C-alpha cells in the first residue's frame, strides 16, 4: 500500500476524535452533578450536612429518571450524594468508578439533606452544587461541557473562575458551518494511515463489554428480549437483528446503572453506543477485516460528531438517532457503498427518524437506540441499491451536507418550544401535578 502523507485537517480530525470519543461511567448528565459534588467535598474536606443543587432544564431532563452506577437508584439527588461520599474529583466522567457499597450506604444517609432545583440559565448544560457544613461552604459550577468546571468557591472566596464560553468550541454557531464536510470525513476515514486511528478500536472493546453485560438483563431488557426471540425463531439471526441486539443491550446496561464505562461520543454514552455497536455487528456479520472495522468506526464516530456540531449539546432531538446516522454511513461502506451511497444513507435516515424526541435519559433510551439502529441498517440497504429519499421531500436536500444543516436547524431552532414543554411535563410529574 502506498504511503499517504498526513494532511493538517486529518491531524485536527484525530484530535477531535480523541477529545469527543472518551470513556464515561454512567449517564453523563448525572455524572456532571456527581463531579461537581465530588469537588465540593474535596474543597470542604468533610461530608456536608446540607447540599443544594441547581441544574439547567435540559440537565434536569436527562438526570431525572436514569440509573446512577453502583447504587441501584435513580436521579440527580443520588448522583450528588454518591459524588460527595465516594466520587473522585479528578476522574472526569468516571467520577464514580471506585464507588464502594459502604459509600453508597453513607450517601443514603445524606439524601434527605440534598435539594435539587432547576435554574433559569442560558446554558443548556449547567450544574451548580453548594455544599455546607458547620459554618463552611463550597460551591462548584460546571457549564457548557460535562466536565468543564468554571467556578470553585470555598467560604465565599473564589478559588477559580473562568468565562462560561468554552475555550474550544465544537458546536457550530447558528450562522456558521463546521470546518468539515462529509466527503472530507469519508476521505479521511478511508485514507489516513491505520496506525494513526488504531485507538478507536477501544470503542468496540469497551461498548461490546457493556453489551455483553446488558444481555444478562438490565433495564427494559430490550437486548435480552431480542436475543431470546432469535432463539425462539420469532426473529431471524440476521444483520439487522444482531445490530439491534448489541446496541440496545449496551444501552440497557448503561441506563440501568451498570458499573462498566461506555465509550461516549460528544459527551453521551448512548451516542457512543449508537455510533459503535451497529458497526461492530455489521463487521462481525460481514466478516470484515480488523482494518475495515477500524476505518468504519472512525467514519461512524466522526460523522456522528459532525452531525452533532449543528445541534446544541442537549436538545429536544434524540441524539442517539443522529449518532446512528454515523453508523449507517459506516455500514454502507462495509456493504461496498461509495461516497454517493453513503450520502444516500444519511439522507434516508434524516428522512426517516429525524423526529424522535429526547424526553430525558432513562431505560427507554435503549428502545430509541434500537429503533435508530434498525433505521441505520435499513437506510444502508436502500442506499447500496441506490434508493434514497428525493430532495423534493421534507428537509432532505440533494446536498447531504445541506440536509445535515437542515436537521440542525430543526433541532436548534424549530424544537425549542418542544424542549420547553417536555421539561415542563417532567417537572410537573415530579411535583405530582401532571394533568
UniProtKB/Swiss-Prot annotation:
It comes from Aeromonas hydrophila subsp. hydrophila (strain ATCC 7966 / DSM 30187 / BCRC 13018 / CCUG 14551 / JCM 1027 / KCTC 2358 / NCIMB 9240 / NCTC 8049). This is UPF0597 protein AHA_4077. HAMAP family: UPF0597 (MF_01845). Belongs to the UPF0597 family. One of its GO terms (biological process) is L-cysteine catabolic process to pyruvate. PANTHER family: UPF0597 PROTEIN YHAM. One of its GO terms (molecular function) is L-cysteine desulfhydrase activity. Pfam families: SDH_alpha. It comes from the Bacteria. InterPro entries: Ser_deHydtase-like_asu, UPF0597.
Amino acid at each position: 500500500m502506498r504511503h499517504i502523507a498526513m494532511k493538517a485537517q486529518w491531524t485536527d480530525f484525530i484530535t477531535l476524535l480523541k477529545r469527543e470519543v472518551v470513556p464515561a461511567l454512567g449517564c453523563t448528565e448525572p455524572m456532571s452533578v456527581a463531579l461537581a459534588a465530588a469537588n465540593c467535598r474535596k474543597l470542604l474536606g468533610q461530608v456536608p450536612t446540607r447540599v443544594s443543587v441547581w441544574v439547567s432544564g435540559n440537565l434536569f431532563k436527562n438526570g431525572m429518571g436514569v440509573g446512577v452506577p453502583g447504587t441501584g437508584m435513580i436521579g440527580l439527588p443520588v448522583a450528588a450524594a454518591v459524588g460527595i461520599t465516594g466520587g473522585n474529583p479528578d476522574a472526569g466522567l468516571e467520577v464514580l468508578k471506585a464507588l464502594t457499597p459502604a459509600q453508597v450506604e453513607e450517601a443514603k444517609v445524606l439524601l434527605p439533606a440534598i435539594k435539587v432545583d432547576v435554574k433559569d440559565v442560558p446554558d443548556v448544560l449547567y450544574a451548580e452544587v453548594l455544599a455546607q457544613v458547620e459554618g463552611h461552604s463550597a460551591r462548584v459550577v460546571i457549564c457548557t461541557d460535562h466536565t468543564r468546571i468554571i467556578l470553585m468557591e470555598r467560604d465565599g472566596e473564589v478559588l477559580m473562575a473562568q468565562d462560561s464560553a468554552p475555550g474550544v468550541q465544537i458546536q457550530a454557531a447558528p450562522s456558521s458551518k463546521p470546518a468539515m464536510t462529509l466527503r472530507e470525513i469519508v476521505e479521511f476515514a478511508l485514507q489516513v494511515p491505520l496506525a494513526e486511528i488504531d485507538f478507536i478500536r477501544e470503542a468496540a472493546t469497551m461498548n461490546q463489554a457493556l453489551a455483553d453485560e446488558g444481555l444478562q438483563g438490565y433495564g427494559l431488557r430490550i437486548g435480552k428480549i431480542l436475543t431470546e426471540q432469535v432463539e425462539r425463531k420469532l426473529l431471524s439471526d440476521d444483520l439487522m437483528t444482531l445490530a439491534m441486539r448489541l446496541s440496545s443491550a449496551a444501552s440497557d446496561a448503561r441506563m440501568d446503572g451498570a458499573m462498566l464505562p461506555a465509550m461516549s461520543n460528544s459527551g453521551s454514552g448512548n451516542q457512543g453506543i449508537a455510533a459503535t455497536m451497529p458497526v461492530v455487528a455489521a463487521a462481525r456479520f460481514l466478516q470484515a477485516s480488523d482494518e475495515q472495522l477500524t476505518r468504519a468506526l472512525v467514519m461512524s464516530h466522526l460523522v456522528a460528531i459532525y452531525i452533532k456540531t449543528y445541534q446544541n449539546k442537549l436538545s429536544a432531538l434524540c441524539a442517539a438517532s443522529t449518532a446512528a446516522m454515523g453508523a449507517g454511513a459506516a455500514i454502507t461502506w462495509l456493504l461496498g457503498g461509495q461516497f454517493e451511497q453513503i450520502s444516500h444513507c444519511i439522507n434516508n435516515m434524516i428522512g426517516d427518524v429525524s423526529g424522535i424526541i429526547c424526553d430525558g435519559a432513562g431505560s427507554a433510551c435503549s428502545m430509541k437506540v434500537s429503533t435508530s439502529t434498525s433505521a441505520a441498517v435499513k437506510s444502508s440497504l436502500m442506499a447500496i441499491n441506490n434508493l434514497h429519499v428525493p430532495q423534493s421531500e421534507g428537509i432532505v436536500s440533494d446536498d447531504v451536507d445541506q440536509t445535515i444543516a437542515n436537521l440542525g436547524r430543526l433541532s436548534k431552532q424549530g424544537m425549542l418550544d418542544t424542549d420547553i414543554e417536555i421539561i415542563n411535563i417532567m417537572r410537573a410529574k415530579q411535583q405530582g401535578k401532571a394533568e
